[in-house]
Each structure stands twice: as C-alpha cells, then as structure tokens.
UniProtKB/Swiss-Prot annotation:
Lineage start: Eukaryota, Fungi, Dikarya, Ascomycota, Taphrinomycotina
Pathway terms, separated by semicolons: Phospholipid metabolism; phosphatidylcholine biosynthesis
PROSITE patterns, per database record: SAM_CHO2 (PS51598)
One GO MF term attached to the UniProt entry: phosphatidylethanolamine N-methyltransferase activity
Protein name as catalogued: Phosphatidylethanolamine N-methyltransferase
Protein keywords: Endoplasmic reticulum, Lipid biosynthesis, Lipid metabolism, Membrane, Methyltransferase, Phospholipid biosynthesis, Phospholipid metabolism, Phosphoprotein, S-adenosyl-L-methionine, Transferase, Transmembrane, Transmembrane helix
Organism: Schizosaccharomyces pombe (strain 972 / ATCC 24843)
GO biological process: methylation; phosphatidylcholine biosynthetic process
Gene: cho2
Highest taxon of the lineage: Eukaryota
Ranges of biased composition (kind: Polar residues): 1-22, 40-58
Mode of membrane association: Multi-pass membrane protein
Membrane side Cytoplasmic: residue ranges: 126-128, 231-236, 290-313, 401-408, 480-493, 574-905
Main location: endoplasmic reticulum
Lumenal side: 1-104, 150-209, 258-268, 335-379, 430-456, 515-552
Enzyme superclass (EC): transferase
Length: 905
C-alpha cells in the first residue's frame, strides 16, 4: 500500500506551488504531498478542453453523491465510479457465500497451498518452509510490484503490457477479454462502465488484482510463519503478560492505522493510482497522516512487532525487521522518485537563509561541515575536528581493556558531553538575551555572518566529539555475549540498533527540513527571513523531535553495552537536551515568533480527536492524563528555568558584593590606623574652609568625553602637594579617606608640588589658596555613570572636600544615516585626541594612538550601542569607513528586534 496522497487540485492547478501558511491544511512530506502538477508537459494547453469535458460530465452526473474525476496523461477527464471498499472485495474473495470468479479461485488456491504446506510439515521443515514462503511473497511485493511501478512511472509499461497481452482486445483475445470484463465488473460498483472507462483506469483495475493476490498471500504467509515459530520464552509471569498485552496492542494499533489510512486515501492511493492517472478532487489529510511520516510504511507495520512479541521468537522478529527495512527501500527507490518526477520537489522554506538588500546577509552557499559531510582538507576547522576525532578513537582502540582505559573512555565521553551542553546552552542563552556572541565579533570588525560561521564550527566540533567519545566509551565497556539466546540479550541488541536507526532518521529528517540555517540555530544569530514557520516533514507530527528522539542513539548504545556508566551519560545527555530546549530554545522562539507558534502538533491533535469524537476508541482519561503529565513536566522545567535565570542574574553581583565587602573591611582597618597617625594634622586644619565645585555644569550632568573644570579653595596652611582625584561614587564608602586608587585620574593643584599631572592646572590664585584644574582626555572616565571629585591633603588619601555627585552621560544616536554618524564622530575625535583634527570624513585616522582609539570606541559604545575594538578604528582609517561600519552593525542588531512572528517551540 502507498501513502502517496493524490492531487487535491484541478488539472489547471497542477503546476501551482504549495501553500506555506501555518494555518492551512498541513502539507504532506514529499511522498505524501498534495499533488498539483500535470504529468503531461502540455497539460496547461489542455485546460479549456478539460474544463469543457468536466462540465459535460457534471451535467450528466447525479449530484446527490460526491463525484470524483480522473485525468489521464493525455488529458482526458473521466468520472470515477463509486468505490467498493477493498476490505469488502478481499472478504468476498474468500467468503464461501459469494460466487467465485476464476481469479478468485487462483487467489484461494494460493492461500490454501500455503495452509496445506503448513499442516503437512513439522518441526524445522515447517518453520523454514513458512519463512521461505513469507520471503517469497515479500520479494514479490517489494521487487515485483516495485519493478512494475518503476516501469509504469518511467515508461508507462504496465498499461502497454496489459494492452499488448490482450486483456482489452476483444477481436484477437475474446476469451481473455470476456474474463477480464466479467472479473472487473464483479468487483466494481454498478456505476462502473467497462467499455467507456479509459485504458489507464481499466489497466489500473487489472493491476489491483495482482496486488491483491500478493497482499493476501503475503499476509497469510506471515501469519503461518508466526504460528510455525511460536514458542514460550522462559521469563516471569509479569513479562509474559506484558509480552502478550504489548503484542495484541500493536496489532490492534496496526489495524487502526491501515483502516484510518484507507479512510483518507481510499483505493486510489492504496493501489498507487497516480502511477496510472491523476485524481482531481480535494482530500483532507488527517487522522493517521498527522501521526507519523509515511504512516503506511512506518507505524503501519507495527503489527510485525506485535506478532513478534506474541510468538516470542527472535526469528520472527528479525524476519519482520528485514521485511520492514525492505519496505522502506520500496519507498525510497520506487515511490519517492515517482513523486519527484511527477510533481517536482517542494521548496523548503525553512531551509532558506535570510537575504536582504544588505550584503551582510548575503551568505555563501551551504558548504559548512555537518558531521563529516562537506569535509574540506583546506579548511582548518575541518582538519582540527578530524585530528581530534582520530586521536579520541585510536587512543581507545589501541589501549588495553584495563580499568584505567575504561575510566579514560568514560571520562572523555562525560567531558565532551558536558562541554557540548554547557557551550551550547550558554552561548545560545546570551546570544538570545543580548546578542553577546555576535557583538563580540562585531567588536573586532567582523560580520554577523562570520560570527555565525564560527559558532557553526564550534557547535559541529562539540556535537561530533560528544557522539564519537560516547560511541568509543560504549565500545570499551561492551562485552560480546557468549550466549545470544540467554535472557534478553538479543532483544537488547535489536532494540538498541533500532533506536540508533531512529536517531539517524530523526537527525537526517531534521536537517532536511531545517537546512543549515535551522540546524545551526540561524535565527539566534541572523534575522529570520519569514515571520512565520512552515511545519513540514517531521515537524508536522511533533514539536521539537530532538527533545526525545534526538537522544535515542544514546539509549540504544546504553542498551547494547548494558553498562551503568553508559546509562548515566545517556541520562545526562537526555536531561541536558531537555533543559536546553525548555530553558533556551523555547523562550527564544516565543520571543522571535510570538503568538504564531503552533499550540498542538499532529500527534497531539490526533489524540485529542480520538478522545473527543463520537464513538472514539480512546477514553477521555487518556487525554487528561497526558495533559497532566505534560503540565507536570513543564512545571518542573519552568521552576528550573526560573531558578537558573535567577542564579545567572544574581550570582555575579552577589559574588562581587562579597569580594567588595571583604576588601572594604580590610581598607577600613587600615583607615583607622592612618587616621590615628594623622589625627594631629587633621585637628589643626578642621577650622579652615576647603571647597570643591564643578564649573559650568547643568543638572549635574556632563557629556562623555567633554572636559570638566573643577574650582577648588583650600586653607592657607594647605600643602603644595595637595591633589584632586576623580572617582566613581560607589568606589569609596568613607567620606574621610579614599579607599581606591585614582588610576591616573588626578591633578596637582600646584606645579611646585609635583613633576607630573600639572598640565591640567588652568589657574592658581596669587595666594595659592584657590584655583582651577581641568580634567580631560586620560584624566576622565570614558564610561557613563555617577562620579565625584575629591580633594586630598598632603599627597595622602585624606579627604578634605568633595564635589556633589555628577553623572556622565552619552548622546543617544538612533540614526542610520552615514553622514550624520560621520559628523558626530568628527566632533567626538577632538575630545579623544586634540592633536587630531580631521576636516572631513575621509581624513585619515591611521595614525591615531591606541589610547585615543579606545576613547573613540567608548563614545561609539555608549552613543550607538556598538562595542568595537580599538583596532577596528585603526584598520578602517577614516570617519567615513568607520561610520559605514557602525551603520551596518546597527542594521544587523536592529534586524533582531523586528516584529514578532511565529516559530515552533
């Protein structure tokens, strides 16, 4: 059976593209997508002819029943007869109450031959005979039907062969013609007209009969094989009950999948109708098609594993696995190529990287290393990964199996997993919160695309090494079983490899759906192109498939190795994965895409429908319990997120406060000793008037970089080596003694008192009891905040006077006009270095000193919010180039703050 979904549009619409709206009926994946393209290259030219034919058919049809139309490759439109359920057709074939056609007797004889073989043989002969029968019919299905469909898809050979063989040739093969006509009419509704139906439709009906033969014999042979291999495993009663209950549940589930799939796709897709003609009616894809990708080939074979449980036979299990794998091969090599050939491939919108007018977002082609795909020996990051990986592998392979070697393997796996989780979490957390990663690279003159490129290399390195080291640890702790039939040894290995295969499939599906942009968290580092998400591929069915399926290989290797240490690392990987998704990814998606995030995935909607519809097969309590479980898990994760965020926000200030408090206590003790030493001098000077004021200040605010003039007045008995320092208001708790160093931000009041820091003296009165000093350049703080000046006595740190606290502020520049930015920088440069006076934006800044460049980057940081390295100023070499860089950086960062849209949590 196929899960390829027929067209929901008219022939005139065959060439249209798919809707990408989240609110639309969900699109199927490539093998089950809404088919829109006409297989005839001249189909668009036949639109009028098709519409006229359809109008004629509509006039004659009975409007009381829904009508469906087919379209042949030649463009002929015909009315499809009403369907008779394939279940009824199959049951009538074996039901003795109905008359039988010659073909029915062929089918019955094939089934009875297998049953007879089952009862005529015993022991090993029966078991292997039944297994051979099953494999024969499986090969007939996958290879036989596959070959026929391949030839039909590529060359229309099945229709040609059936026609050439004489099935519809009344003149040359009248008996075969009559038998065919009688057989088809007996299995169809009264609305079917053999003579007027197109050749393609009648050929499809003949093809269906061969398919039914293979399907019925395949089913019968599998049941007989299961009965032949049935045994009673030696396990306790609880496991016996779980085995039987699980087997029955899987078989019932399999039956529901098949029936629900047939309800949706009907016989047309069940029997690969679109290999012969196209259907022209709308289908609503719900039910099982929202449960899993390729449901007819994935969950549709759950009954295989149910039967394996009931029989208790590993032979049946491995035969089922082999048959299931062959079915996926059928999908891969027969159906998917037909879909792509007939309907084209879908444009994967999620894979598209952001593009815009700004060259910043013109990303190079996708050639980054993913795993070891796209490996390039000329790329140092690729070579580094290869060297580290080979070192990690060979150090384990070449070492002995001692406890030390096992410890090293476990330690290596733990460290890489821990590093991957920590680096992954913290970089993405701070990137989402403040774009810290991007700003770091912009600061050094790089682009946002370069920042993302570096993240991709780091992420791929830690991800690959976490996998490689874990595999090597599992290898080191694995012991080859001496008895594969003992206990659950074979089952552990089968489940383990199954989980590994599931992990690989999930990862490949995620990458195919998201592309490199999504795989490497592009919307954390670059602006999203679309405000909405397209839920396609595996994301149609589940939100965050990597949440659990993304760690299935860890659990698979843990089962295979049967090591407690490997289980422990698997638990660490699973918990860290859950934490990153819940604490980092989901908040970011909510922030970027807002209310357009999907509330329910396909599986959730399916369960909800199953518990709400009339006559549902699931009790309402199932939905209630699942909601309660989900709520509980989310509540725990929310509380963890709040605690983690509180820790991240409060831990650094608390640590800083603790260190500062310790330092303050030490300084206070030293302060007391110094105050006692200088107490006589202080007591003799307390009656004199010391004053300190800032000249020309408005509202106690000063612009960043602007010179500050300080007026001072001192006692006639003051010392010539008195001095004035500039400090942050929060740096000194005492008003009597300065506890922190001025770090060069001080000025002498008298040139006779010092040999340096005298150039800032603007004036000194004749009696030398008052004067002015100007703080500029290196004497200033080049950051915003609240500050104060302090007058100190006699070259010491004894405070005689202070100014009122004042605030250094920066002009907020919100413009992205290059000329305005350049003009602002020209004004600011004179405060950074008075010796540089560029007259226009193209004047050279190549000779600017490191100190002056640092001052200019401080002004840029507080005025524009762009943190640049001083080297960038020197490299750009002019205000114009620097202005363009600032504007481009602003556009990059502002693009992250666009309107909220939608993305999957």
């Amino acid at each position: 059976m196929t899960n390829q979904i027929p067209s929901a549009s008219s022939a005139a619409d065959f060439g249209s593209s798919k809707s990408t709206s989240v609110d639309a009926v969900p699109n199927m994946d490539k093998s089950s997508s809404v088919r829109r393209k006409n297989i005839d290259s001249n189909g668009l030219q036949q639109t009028n002819q098709i519409e006229q034919a359809e109008s004629s058919l509509n006039a004659e049809a009975d409007h009381s029943e829904p009508e469906r139309y087919g379209c042949t490759p030649s463009g002929k439109v015909f009315l499809l007869p009403k369907e008779q359920e394939n279940r009824r057709s199959i049951l009538e074939t074996v039901d003795p109450r109905f008359s039988k056609t010659p073909w029915d007797w062929i089918v019955i004889s094939s089934i009875l031959a297998q049953v007879l073989l089952f009862f005529m043989t015993t022991g090993a002969v029966r078991r292997y005979s039944m297994m051979l029968c099953f494999f024969f019919w499986r090969i007939s299905y996958d290879a036989g039907i596959g070959f026929l469909l391949h030839m039909q898809s590529n060359h229309r050979k099945v229709v040609t062969w059936i026609s050439d063989f004489g099935f519809f040739d009344k003149e040359n093969h009248p008996k075969l013609y009559d038998l065919t006509k009688k057989q088809l009419i007996s299995k169809m509704d009264s609305s079917y007209n053999y003579d007027t139906s197109p050749l393609e439709f009648n050929s499809w009906l003949v093809f269906r009969h061969f398919v039914d033969l293979i399907l019925m014999c395949d089913f019968c042979s599998y049941i007989l094989m299961g009965l032949a291999w049935t045994c009673w495993p030696k396990v306790n009663i609880i496991l016996q009950f779980l085995r039987i209950f699980g087997g029955i549940a899987l078989i019932v589930f399999n039956y529901w999948v098949k029936m629900d799939a047939h309800r949706v796709v009907r016989d047309y897709a069940w029997y690969w109708g679109d290999f012969f003609f196209l259907l022209r009616s709308s289908l609503v894809f719900n039910g099982v098609f929202e449960l899993a990708p390729h449901p007819m080939y994935s969950v549709g074979y759950a009954g295989y594993y149910g039967m394996s449980l009931l029989t208790g036979s590993y032979a049946v299990l491995f035969a089922s696995i082999l048959a299931h794998a062959a079915q996926f091969g059928f999908l891969l090599f027969v159906e998917n190529p037909h879909i792509e050939r007939t309907y084209g491939t879908d444009i994967n919108h999620a894979r598209l990287s952001p593009r815009g007018e700004d060259n910043e977002f013109e990303l190079p082609p996708e050639h980054d290393l993913v795993g070891f795909v796209n490996f390039d020996f000329t790329r140092i990051s690729d070579v580094a990964l290869l060297i580290i990986a080979l070192y990690s592998i060979f150090i384990i392979l070449l070492s002995s199996n001692s406890h030390y070697s096992q410890f090293w393997a476990i330690f290596q796996a733990f460290v890489w997993r821990f590093l991957h989780s920590i680096i992954h979490a913290f970089i993405l957390f701070y990137q989402s919160k403040s774009k810290a990663w991007t700003k770091h690279f912009i600061r050094n003159g790089e682009s946002a695309a370069y920042a993302w490129s570096q993240w991709k290399g780091l992420y791929n390195l830690t991800l690959n090494m976490s996998y490689i080291s874990f595999v090597m640890a599992a290898w080191k702790l694995y012991h080859l079983p001496s008895n594969w039939t003992y206990g659950l040894v074979s089952l552990r290995h089968a489940l383990g490899f199954g989980l590994i295969a599931l992990h690989i499939y999930t990862s490949v599906s995620i990458y195919e759906d998201l592309g490199q942009y999504g795989w490497f968290y592009g919307d954390f580092f670059l602006p999203s192109r679309s405000p909405k998400l397209v839920y396609q591929g595996i994301y149609r069915y589940v939100n965050n498939p990597e949440r659990f399926l993304g760690c299935s290989a860890y659990w698979g290797l843990a089962l295979i190795s049967s090591s407690a240490w490997i289980f422990l690392i698997a638990i660490l990987a699973q918990l860290s994965n859950l934490a990153i998704i819940r604490l980092v990814e989901q908040p970011h998606m909510q922030k970027v895409y807002g209310n357009t995030l999907r509330k329910e995935a396909g599986i959730s909607k399916l369960i909800k429908q199953a518990t709400s519809e009339k006559g549902n097969i699931l009790p309402k309590t199932v939905e209630t319990h699942m909601k309660a479980l989900t709520t509980s898990v989310d509540k725990v994760l929310d509380q963890t997120a709040e605690a983690l965020e509180e820790f991240v926000n409060t831990a650094p200030p608390k640590v800083q406060e603790l260190l500062k408090g310790t330092e303050s206590n030490l300084r206070k003790n030293a302060q007391l000793a110094i105050l006692k030493l200088f107490a006589p001098q202080l007591s003799s000077s307390t009656h004199f008037d010391y004053k300190l004021e800032i000249k020309g200040i408005d509202n106690n605010q000063v612009l960043l970089g602007h010179p500050i003039t300080v007026c001072w007045t001192a006692s006639p008995n003051h010392e010539i080596n008195d001095w004035i320092g500039l400090y942050k208001l929060s740096d000194n708790a005492s008003d009597l003694y300065t506890q922190t160093s001025s770090e060069g931000r001080w000025s002498a009041i008298d040139a006779n008192g010092y040999t340096s820091h005298c150039s800032s003296i603007k004036s000194l009165s004749n009696d030398k009891n008052s004067g002015e000093v100007e703080f500029s350049g290196d004497l200033l703080f080049w950051e915003t905040g609240t500050f104060e000046f302090r007058y100190h006595y006699g070259g010491k740190h004894l405070v005689m006077a202070k100014t009122e606290p004042f605030v250094i502020t920066a002009t907020s520049m919100n413009t992205t006009d290059v000329d305005e930015v350049s003009a602002y920088l020209l004004k600011s440069i004179k405060f950074c270095d008075p010796n540089i006076t560029p007259h226009d934006g193209d004047a050279s800044l190549c000779d600017i000193s490191e100190g002056s460049a640092r001052k200019l980057t401080s002004i840029i940081k507080y005025s524009f919010g762009i943190d640049l390295s001083y080297r960038v100023v020197q490299v750009d070499g002019s205000c114009s180039a620097l202005s363009r860089r600032i504007v481009n950086s602003l556009k990059i960062l502002q693009s992250f703050d666009g309107p909220s849209g939608a993305k999957d949590d």
